[in-house]
Amino acid sequence: MEYKITKEELGNDWLYSTLVALNKCMAEHGLPLYVVDARARDVAMKLMKGDEPKRRTEDLDVAIAIEDWQTFDDICKTLENNHFKRHGETQKFFYKGVNGDLDFEVDIVPFGGVAVDEKIGWPPEGNPVMSVKCFQDVMNEAVTVIVNGEIEVKMAPLCGQFLIKLDTWNDRNASTDKDAEDMLFILKNYLDIQLLYQKDNVPPDVVTFDNESLDAIIWGAQWLAYDISKLLTTEHLQFYADLASAELKKEEKSNLIYHFMKYYGNSEMGDFSSNYEPCRQIWSVFVKIFSKELEERKKQ
């Protein structure tokens, strides 16, 4: 699938200039440029006429598929030779522009053969560690975005963006709940976007529009869970089914459900206890649809 967006629609000259420079650098290594995380979400919402996120991002996260750290070092050198300044020995760069008048933050996330046990440990010490478990599955379904008719970038589909956020939440939920906020934002927009662009492809026997007692967000969860279930390998599908199931078993003690409750809405004076049931129901949908897909694969 291919989308087009103009520089004006992108709405950020620094971002555009950074994408142009990154695209040039990655092309030198024969690598596609994958845009992920919050910036991918923001661009997707512009392309698909979704809601504007309340929490805007001021940086850019990109992913690259590489086999070893030597390739990563070579890419870093190319970036530094093209007006990117590296922050220490980390994956963080700042694009300074040809004239040195920019300062746009970029995080480079490697995945693929460079990962060990589907995790990235930054050299030389091998930390911090982050999961890239779902990255290959997601990037296999990446959509193409042509920016201003000049540059081509790959972007995780919305269902893949949700999954990357779930991975990130699983890594750091003890210290932050912002990944749950991002997941919930995608979920709240998912049904409307799918009905706008995929209205003739409603998953059969999955999205229960005939059950009018359900909130629209549950229909969105059904569709989102279905799309994710078709994107994942069986091993990864089992992992995320187990993750969601384990959180449901914790009931009110679940961090995942609690974080969703905080951002679900309908709370007064900081009391969001009434959000427990709809948030529990959302994750029950994921477990049900993931489990159904796993059972169907066993029969094949």
Segments from the language model and where they lie:
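Compositionally biased terminal segments of proteins
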Residues: 1-300
